């Protein structure tokens, strides 16, 4: 790695910082050693990250113990990265470039809608809770990046990318991207408790994601659990000064995952790949 601290620790303390001609002393042949002073002084950059979250809730209770809630939210995460390496930076000297600048920005937005309706009722030693809901989530990820090199001056840093002559030679880099996906869920949960001792929970969720293939977008995810609060039993009375809760639980459930890139289930085209045409491989 090129970390400044790592390079400083690796450095032979008897080696000079500067050559006699005023350039930085480098010793690339030994353990990929780079001058840490040069790394500090011959590059500049800025990185900013912002995270914004907005949430709104509306709850109403048409009848006693029955509540319905509407929740809307948006979360936006963005980062802005830019930097510049002078012609004295080790990578620029080794590649015979006079300055390198880059600029990139990325933004990830999540819009979420959730509607839930729950009911609870308690009588004698019994407790009953039920909940049904719907969730809609839309995600968008987009960004761009550009870089250029061979600058006549270091004055502008990353603030004038077009000044580098690599752009005129068709060697500058530029890229952008955007992808989106949708996640929808219907869910329900029922809970029953008796005398604060025994609790049963049953739930099911039907969820669909645009990331999956045409015939595999939806799935069912059931779950069940049984719990026993032993501290409410008479034979545990003498331990209540030491223990406040002892609740064995057994549970079973099926979960899913969609933490992979969008469009993996689709056949896509690009201009950089190769394909077989008329008995030979063609790029395009």
Question: What annotation goes with each model-predicted range?
Answer:
Residues 200-209, 250-252:
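Transmembrane beta-strand segments that form the barrel wall of outer-membrane beta-barrel proteins
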Residues 186-204:
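Short, contiguous hydrophobic alpha-helices characteristic of membrane insertion segments
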Residues 1-51, 69-184, 232-284:
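Surface-exposed loop/interface segments of Gram-negative outer-membrane beta-barrel transport/assembly proteins
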Residues 57, 61, 67-71, 127-131, ...:
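Membrane-spanning beta-strand positions in outer-membrane beta-barrel proteins
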Residues 210-215:
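Solvent-exposed loop/turn segments connecting transmembrane beta-strands
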Residues 153-154, 220-228:
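Feature captures outer-membrane beta-barrel proteins of Gram-negative bacteria and organelles
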